[in-house]
Every structure is written in structure tokens, then in C-alpha cells.
């Protein structure tokens, strides 16, 4: 994803700046095995495509063993069927493996983002995932909203993803994302111009 979006190396550097690394398994492609034998909070950034393709769309996944909750964060807030339709991505297998390996009763709660915070032509999905993981490691019981990291972002229903009347809201979210990273990531500050070019709000139209 050199021309657009975020590389694995870039995401790992930003995650490190955000102090997520102690809980971070790494960046993975669609073959991510799930959270296996994890008795502490842990998280990962997962691409919907195989590594050999260069990547398509980044998701964040996180595991809170205290509440036995599996979090899946998609900046677009796509439904399960839409993820499968658009990206041919299904997470039931890794969710099942996580449940079997990580809980005595093999039962987990799935908590999934279901609203949109990212513009339809934005390539900032990986950066939004880093932001979410910062919220998760600091507020693992309520990472989606009502915390200082994700709280300032405004979500819209997924069916309005392309609605012209909400594009300003999604654009503002991306500006807030950049400001958050400028404040908290030395890597982002050092490479801000290039990162903003590769993840621009209208990148997929270029």
C-alpha cells in the first residue's frame, strides 16, 4: 500500500508511539488466527486482504478477557454481509478460535462498530485503527465512544456513507484524527506531509 493508505511498518511505528505496543500482537493480513490463549488485554490491526495483494482495508481487533469481549472496529462500520460482499472478508473463524482458546466456557461477546466515521474515498483506515487501539488499551471496557480519544469523533449511519450532507462530518473526523496523531505520535509528526498525502480524504478518487 505504498501509493495509498498505510503500510504495516508505519502502523507499527504509530502504535508504538501511542503506547499500545505492550498489548499489540502486530499487523496481520486476512489470515489472522485470532486471540489464542490470551489472558490479558491484547489487540491487532488486520487487513481484509492477503498480504500478497498489498492490502485493501484495515480493521482493528481487540480482546478484553475480563469481560470476555471481542471488539471489531471498522472505520466504515460495514455490516457482516457488506464486509463479505465488498472485501470477501469473514471473521467467524478467528472469532471462534479466539473463543475456544481464550475462555473456559468458549463463549465471547462480540462488540462491533456499526456506524461510519471515515469518508468513502478516504485511505486513512489504518490510522483510524491506531486511534481506536489507543482508546482500547486505555479504556478497554468502553473503547468505541465516551472516552477522550474516540469521543470527539462523530459517527453517521453506514447507509449514509456516500450522502453528500454528511461528508463534512467525516472530513472533520479525519482532521481530528490527524490532530490526535500530531499530538501523540513522533513518527506521524516526522512524516506528516507524506502520510496525509497517502491517506487523504479523497485519495480513492485520485
UniProtKB/Swiss-Prot annotation:
Keywords (A to Z) from UniProt: Autocatalytic cleavage, Disulfide bond, DNA-binding, Host nucleus, Hydrolase, Late protein, Protease, Thiol protease, Virion
Chief place where the protein resides: virion
Catalytic activity field: Cleaves proteins of the adenovirus and its host cell at two consensus sites: -Yaa-Xaa-Gly-Gly-|-Xaa- and -Yaa-Xaa-Gly-Xaa-|-Gly- (in which Yaa is Met, Ile or Leu, and Xaa is any amino acid)
InterPro entries per record: Papain-like_cys_pep_sf, Peptidase_C5
One Pfam family it belongs to: Peptidase_C5
Subcellular location: Virion; Host nucleus
Enzyme Commission number(s) from the entry: 3.4.22.39
Record keyword Protease present: yes
GO MF terms, alphabetically ordered: cysteine-type endopeptidase activity; DNA binding
Induction summary: Expressed in the late phase of the viral replicative cycle.
Alphabetical GO biological process terms: proteolysis
Gene Ontology terms: cellular component: host cell nucleus; virion component
Active site per database record: 57, 74, 125
Chain positions of site Cleavage: 54-55
Quaternary organization: Interacts with protease cofactor pVI-C; this interaction is necessary for protease activation.
Main function: Cleaves viral precursor proteins (pTP, pIIIa, pVI, pVII, pVIII, and pX) inside newly assembled particles giving rise to mature virions. Protease complexed to its cofactor slides along the viral DNA to specifically locate and cleave the viral precursors. Mature virions have a weakened organization compared to the unmature virions, thereby facilitating subsequent uncoating. Without maturation, the particle lacks infectivity and is unable to uncoat. Late in adenovirus infection, in the cytoplasm, may participate in the cytoskeleton destruction. Cleaves host cell cytoskeletal keratins K7 and K18.
More details: All late proteins expressed from the major late promoter are produced by alternative splicing and alternative polyadenylation of the same gene giving rise to non-overlapping ORFs. A leader sequence is present in the N-terminus of all these mRNAs and is recognized by the viral shutoff protein to provide expression although conventional translation via ribosome scanning from the cap has been shut off in the host cell.
HAMAP family (alphabetical): ADV_PRO
Family membership noted in the UniProt record: Belongs to the peptidase C5 family.
Name by which UniProt lists this protein: Protease
Amino acid at each position: 500500500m505504498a501509493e495509498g493508505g498505510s503500510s504495516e511498518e508505519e502502523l507499527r511505528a504509530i502504535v508504538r508511539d501511542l503506547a499500545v505496543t505492550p498489548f499489540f500482537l502486530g499487523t496481520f493480513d486476512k489470515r489472522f488466527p485470532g486471540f489464542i490463549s490470551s489472558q490479558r488485554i491484547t489487540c491487532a490491526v488486520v487487513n481484509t486482504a492477503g498480504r500478497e495483494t498489498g492490502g485493501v482495508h484495515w480493521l482493528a481487533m481487540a480482546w478484553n478477557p475480563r469481560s470476555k469481549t471481542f471488539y471489531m472496529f471498522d472505520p466504515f462500520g460495514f455490516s457482516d454481509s457488506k464486509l463479505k460482499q465488498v472485501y470477501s472478508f469473514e471473521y467467524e473463524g478467528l472469532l471462534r478460535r479466539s473463543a475456544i482458546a481464550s475462555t473456559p466456557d468458549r463463549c465471547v461477546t462480540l462488540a462491533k462498530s456499526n456506524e461510519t466515521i471515515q469518508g468513502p474515498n478516504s485511505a486513512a483506515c489504518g490510522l483510524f485503527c491506531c486511534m481506536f487501539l489507543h482508546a482500547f488499551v486505555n479504556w478497554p471496557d468502553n473503547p468505541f465512544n465516551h472516552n477522550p480519544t474516540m469521543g470527539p469523533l462523530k459517527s453517521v449511519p453506514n447507509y449514509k456513507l456516500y450522502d453528500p450532507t454528511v461528508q463534512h462530518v467525516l472530513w472533520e473526523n479525519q482532521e481530528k484524527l490527524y490532530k490526535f496523531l500530531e499530538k501523540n505520535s513522533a513518527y506521524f509528526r516526522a512524516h506528516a506531509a507524506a502520510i496525509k498525502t497517502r491517506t487523504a480524504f479523497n485519495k480513492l478518487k485520485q
